[in-house]
A protein has these predicted regions:
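A short alpha-helix capping/helix-loop junction motif
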Residues: 184-185
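Structured aminoacyl-transfer and RNA-binding surfaces used for tRNA recognition/handling
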Residues: 1-181, 197-235
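Long, charged amphipathic helices and adjacent flexible linkers at domain junctions
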Residues: 190-194
Length: 238
């Protein structure tokens, strides 16, 4: 294993055989198959060499073993569930999303996708804000803004037309505060940031819909059926 320059060396992965019920049934199914039977839960790197960035290697004076385990993957194995979204601490967040949206897990594939997106994104957003990141139009803040807006859009797909993500923060905090105590300390702040961003996005959507309605009426009056590139860009930029 190596990443550009610096310490590197041989690596090994530890897989867990989840059993035939997660397999593809093919005779050659083994570690590395695309099915869900064999799950990588641990990675081990034996750091023995130093790469100077030009593929010249020298032996490290101080060798070490660098290891990393997927905590939620281990939970999937220990709880014998289908995916990380079925792990108890994550499913409790999804249940809160269901309570707020009226959509329940297992009803349909499309609804399940939306529930998973909202669950995943609100977890990520809660931790990001706790670590000091705020929604913005560039860098890390832009990633946070995209996560919140995508989650809000999936809320709309489930019939929610008002801010609701901020109401899930308490559940995210409850499920993680034993390991991350600062979540509870900053909960009020996190909730306020998310609600403010949701309200801002709602105003943006409303304004964009008004502009779209005006454009549509103008095109229909002229008998036009195609939006110009300039109009499309204006809608995108709005």
């Amino acid at each position: 294993w190596e990443h550009g320059s610096g310490p590197c060396g041989p690596c090994s992965e530890i897989y867990y055989d989840r059993g035939e019920k997660y397999g593809c049934g093919k005779p050659g199914c083994t570690v590395g198959c695309d099915c869900d039977r064999y799950m990588e839960v641990w990675n081990v790197v034996f750091s023995q060499f130093d790469n100077d960035g030009h593929d010249h290697y020298t032996e490290l004076k101080q060798k070490n073993i660098d290891t990393g385990m997927g905590l939620e993957r281990l939970a999937v194995v220990c709880q014998d569930v289908d995916s990380l979204f079925d792990v108890d601490t994550v499913m409790n967040i999804t249940n809160k999303v269901s309570q707020l949206t009226g959509a329940f897990y297992g009803q349909s594939l499309k609804r399940d996708v939306s529930l998973r997106v909202i669950t995943d994104h609100i977890r990520a957003a809660t931790f990001m804000i706790c670590d000091g990141i705020l929604p913005s139009n560039e860098g890390r803040g832009y990633v946070l803004r995209r996560l919140l807006r995508r989650a809000a859009r999936h809320g709309k797909l489930l019939g929610v037309n008002e801010p609701f993500l901020y109401r899930i923060v308490d559940t995210v905090v409850h499920e993680n505060e034993c390991q991350y105590g600062d979540l509870r300390e900053k909960q009020t702040y996190i909730t306020k940031v998310i609600r403010t961003e949701e309200e801002s996005f709602a105003r943006t959507i409303d304004g964009g819909m008004r502009i779209f309605a005006e454009m549509l009426a103008e095109h229909q009056a002229k008998g036009e059926t195609v939006f110009s590139g300039a109009d499309a860009f204006k809608l995108y930029d709005t």
